Swiss-Prot record:
Lipid biosynthesis as UniProt keyword: no
A Pfam short name: SIS
UniProt keyword list: Aminotransferase, Cytoplasm, Glutamine amidotransferase, Repeat, Transferase
Descriptive protein name: Glutamine--fructose-6-phosphate aminotransferase [isomerizing]
Amino acid sequence: MCGIVGVTGKDSAVSILLNGLEKLEYRGYDSAGIYVNDQDGHDYLVKEKGRIDDLRKEVGEAVHGSTGIGHTRWATHGEPSVANAHPQVSADGRFYLVHNGVIENFEDLKQTYLSDVTFKSQTDTEVIVQLVDRFVTKEGLSTLAAFRKTLGLLGHSSYGFLLMDKEDPDTLYVAKNKSPLLIGVGEGFNVVCSDSLAMLDQTKDFLELHDGEIVVVKPDEIKITNQAGEPVERKPFHVDIDAAQADKGTYPFYMLKEIDEQPNVMRKLSQVYLNDAGDPIINDDLLTALKAADRLYIVAAGTSYHAGLVGAKLFESLANVPTEVHVSSEFAYNQPLLSAHPFFIFLTQSGETADSREVLLNVNDQHFPSLTITNVPNSTLSREATYTLLLHAGPEIAVASTKAYTAQIALQAILAKALGVAVDQPAATAFDVKQQLALVANGMQSLVDEKATFEKIAKSALLNTPNAFYIGRGLDYAVSLETALKLKEISYVQAEGFASGELKHGTIALIEKDTPVIGIITQKNTAGLTRSNLQEVAARGAKTVTIVTDSLAKDGDTVILPTVDERLTALLSVVPGQLLAYYTSLNKGLDVDKPRNLAKSVTVE
């Protein structure tokens, strides 16, 4: 959600901070700010409501420094405003703080320690910077000791903190709990960021931080300590991503670029996880743990949850293992009765989803095995799960996920094939996943090459509607949920996906003249039923659009999909939905990549 950047030891601190914040725009934000110090007695605080471009204009040419911190804020406490933007400042102007997370007990802390302080913002963050100042000025503690004491008062709150002391201007104080932060290691300088993408043009070597750790960062020194104040030794990891991969190139929006990248993502997964004979390359220990499970539990949120619905069908049909799919925010506080030998699979693009992590922590406490499937190496959920599989999809910047969704499904297909073969399931042995993913990649390419067709459909059916419905059965229902979410996210159309058999149980009352109803038909055993449902809504004036596999197509169908194995049709049927959402948003003049009120990485509950 919020983005954090910091740098010490670079004369170009201002441009590094602003460029870093721009690379974090995809996380979602409503205001931004920076604080820089030149270590010669000059410092600058600039905050702005709105976009980074607005902040950059406000900064201008006069602001300079060699150490600084920056932040993009996604409002949780207090409305979007300059006063509530970060950095937040102590009453005497000595301390500056940026923060991602939620301080659960900030009202109690205000009443207990700061009843005499006049606050300038509505944020929980200001409470923290005022506490640090109070412990330094009133109790004579050092900045580090005051910071540590403050952290000890926060209970189970989530936070990623980056603090500066005006009287020690080349030092950054860093702490985290349940919120991602990394230290980027340079030569004669160091950086801090909530996502390595922000600083890949400065360094590709990063130190991960664990919950409860505090770090003191200087230009030529990084000191990590644990909650007890004991030193922690840790080697940096290398991020093998070219910064250019995170650029739009010639595309107008990241989302379109990422839709177009999906065929190559399918091919990449085949290269990484399948040998020349088409056999899965999966860790033996992971397969052993999966074989020992009597039930799989897929836990995810948003688009990843929809990918999990498809994954469950793959595990059950190929490996004959019962599989449940749960929304992570519900599972975290309403855990169902579990089987005797559960195995948990966490689907998360970022590897930082707060709700999913809460479930994983509970799973670890119960000593159950787990797997994280994520696009981000060294992310929190990848570190804390028993096993990790990477999506290898490349950076996904647009808030609305596309290629990570299809990568999650494809990798679950490979894993289900591997497990099925390991437990001697004939269906898995017969399933040629390598050949099918090649067909999928080619099919995706044929679809993304027909952009003009999808723009025409979007303009005709979706551009001027206040609501839309996506229907299907089985796997098509799962895709209906995802494609409706895409339209909802980026074009602000009230779109709903539901099982087509439920039409007569209430939803058909909402159908009127020209209401768009998109029917997805890829499953032979339910094709006739879904067509019947579409005829029912058409008779009531609905404007119907059909997305149909070639082998099931009839005259008058709108979009014809290449034929692939029925278990993988979701990988193709979702692409038209992605493009319809994109072109609806584009022709409404909206910001496709950064829809209102949304964040790419949801790091608070």
